[in-house]
Amino acid sequence: MTAPVRNVWWDRLRGARSARGARPEPDRAAAGFAFGQGWARESESEREREPTAIAEPPRPGRLAAHFEANAEGPGIWKWRHYFEAYERHLAKFVGRSPRVVEIGVYSGGSLEMWKQYFGTGCEIIGVDIEEACRAYAGPSVEIVIGDQADPAFWAGFVERFDALDVVIDDGGHLPEQQIATLEALLPRLRDGGVYICEDVTGVENEFQDYCDGLARNLNAEEWISESPATVKPSGFQTQVHSIHRYPFLVAIERTPEPVAELIAPRHGTEWQPFFDGP
């Protein structure tokens, strides 16, 4: 059996800690939270400082424009700051006939918004617990009635709709509902797919805690080479590209294709002698 490769950087870090002497480990999560609490809102005088780089403010995207123009007809209820995140993560699907699932139909307006945004050929699947939402079915839009907190409902759902491109959870907003939905649908996203969960509110939110734990998997390491530094990705790292956090919103992106290795090669010929890593 091949001996496991040492993580030389971690070995050196542990050695440096030992040299400083034993100290009680601080609660890093609490420290990070406290650091965020210490930020004050900018005063008017601070806002008047000249920025280091001047850029034009971003123009409203198509989704924001659709929302602002929706003065009549089926209702759309969204936080305005969501639209920038939508455009950032979902623009790649425009014109590519994606299969989109939105949990939480409510008054139906967002179904039409997604249909207009993604363009001809997209398939929109709205999920809601209320039978009245069947009224919003139509061309390219299917309505499925069910309880998003029920794993049995999702088991039947993925038998019908196995491969998904986009999931937007705007459903009941309870952590147990959000977790059940994520665990059922995140694995069903195609390569490059995007999972968005809205309305993750409150600093002591259980779905937020769940995502904190989920994100730790991105930092797993199984070293297979020191020169060049190479890590064999875990199953999670192979399939999940990134987890993004915004006020009240979480976006998870699947990798465009399975990742074979995580590698840190050295480029260049001149190196300081104080670090003799790979």
Residue ranges and their predicted role:
Residues T2-V166, G172-C197, T201-P278:
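A short alpha-helical cap/connector motif
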